[in-house]
Design a protein with these regions (language model features):
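Structured C-terminal helix/loop/strand segments within mature extracytoplasmic catalytic/sensor domains
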Residues: 197-249
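Short, surface-exposed loop or secondary-structure junction motifs
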Residues: 1-192
Length: 249
């Protein structure tokens, strides 16, 4: 069986309370990704590459992604509330629940990653599963805004930050792991700005031109994914625009 209500030798991966998935699921997921066709040479939003990035990093450093990011970034940045699998570190009262999952786990997802694929990877994934708060994320985005430096410590080379936060291909609004502006206005985010939005209702944005860091955290999937008014009404983007209009002359 793929799933078990109890943890045993064959079912060690916990996807939520009282549900464990077979250990071989990770190899199955990677095999499916390896076998997937490349398709046409056009832009397509996909998480598949980030599954592979995680596997590559863990192989190179000999540590899981959670341990690696804690040691390389989060602890020295003072991001003490940022982690994968937060139930292992914090009480449930300190963790916000997300969706009542009717298609996979059949319960309120609380303390576990919302993304089903990341859940199958044990909650530590390259594309989803990171829990944090606004203060920690402000530190991370400020480090990016500083060109990879924070608190007199260098985490990334300036050219690395510049490469990942620039528009990668003509005709789309993506950097490497970051969003870019599709269009810009006189009063609003600059072309140099970059950030990221999350499915559960989050947004981080940094603008080197105006020295602005914007953090928006919401819980729009609690308790259901639809209707997605947050995206339809562009709440995150509209609040960001109000900030620019209040600051810029």
């Amino acid at each position: 069986d793929f799933y078990s209500r109890k943890q045993d030798d064959e079912h060690q991966i916990k996807v939520t309370d009282n549900i464990y998935i077979i250990n071989s699921i990770k190899d199955t997921i990677y095999e499916d990704i390896y076998k997937s066709s490349l398709g046409s040479k056009s832009y397509e939003y996909s998480d598949l590459g980030y599954y592979i990035f995680k596997k590559k990093l863990e192989k190179d450093f000999g540590k899981d992604l959670n341990q690696l990011t804690q040691e390389k970034f989060y602890q020295s940045l003072g991001m003490y509330r940022t982690t994968f699998n937060p139930k292992e570190k914090f009480s449930l009262e300190d963790i916000i629940p997300t969706e009542y999952d009717k298609t996979y786990r059949n319960q309120l997802v609380h303390g576990f990653v919302h993304d089903q694929g990341a859940a199958m990877m044990g909650g530590i994934a390259g594309h989803a599963g990171l829990f944090s708060n606004s203060i920690d994320l402000a530190k991370l985005m400020q480090m990016y805004l500083n060109g990879g430096e924070y608190g007199d410590e260098v985490y990334l080379k300036p050219e690395t930050v510049a490469e990942f936060t620039k528009q990668q291909f003509k005709g789309n609004h993506r950097g490497a792991g970051f969003d870019k502006m599709q269009t810009t206005s006189k009063i609003g985010p600059s072309a140099e700005s970059f950030g990221h939005t999350g499915f559960t209702g989050t947004m981080v944005w940094a603008d080197p031109k105006y020295n602005i860091v914007y953090i928006f955290l919401s819980n729009r999937v609690n308790e259901t994914v639809e209707p997605n008014y947050l995206s339809v009404k562009k709440v995150r983007e509209n609040i960001r625009q109000v900030i620019y209009e209040a600051i810029l002359p």
